[in-house]
Amino acid sequence: NIHNEVEVTKLDHTFESESESEFLKAYQKQQYAKPSVTVDMAVFTIIDSVLRVLTIQRKGHPYKGFLALPGGFLNVKDDPLDQGEDLEEAAHRELEEETSLPRGSCFLEQLYTFGKAGRDPRTRVISVAYFALVPPHLAYQAVAGDDAASLAWLNLEEIQQKGMAFDHAEILAKAIA
């Protein structure tokens, strides 16, 4: 309708007269909901000629005691000049914290983004999944750390039998597809 077109024109005109710094000072970021962002890694290696997936057993809630892929929350800061870590930095950090595998010791590539509402019972969480390959000679260096109660290199059948926390079975399925 004409009234809406006039309002849009007025808004566009207002933004044109502001400098970017004025716009950013007046920007109301609280107007938009903020989902949490996590990174999860589907980590693979070959042990005794069998494809294995690095799994952790969760130390705490939610899904305490369940199998999960290594991962965790992106460190975000509320400072426009220092907004926190990048996704890939978070993936390397989480992999090192939960498995003790040193940064740069494995191939890591972004796989897919998972954002289905309800995928995490704590809050709205969007997860950026990564595909990782660990050379077999380094696989034995992996040790549970951080919020992992234990760690294991399992074959796909073992994982299917035990099930996984969150939507990690879906992430794993995407990684092997």
Predicted regions and their residues:
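Low-complexity, highly charged intrinsically disordered N-terminal segments
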Residues: 2-6
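Short, functional N-terminal and low-complexity linear motifs
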Residues: 7-10, 50-56, 138-143, 169-171
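Entry/capping segment at the start of metal-dependent catalytic domains
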Residues: 7-24
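Short amphipathic alpha-helical segments, especially helix-boundary/capping motifs
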Residues: 14-18, 59-63, 149-153, 177
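N-terminal strand-loop-strand
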Residues: 22, 26-69, 88, 103
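Unchanged
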Residues: 67, 74-176
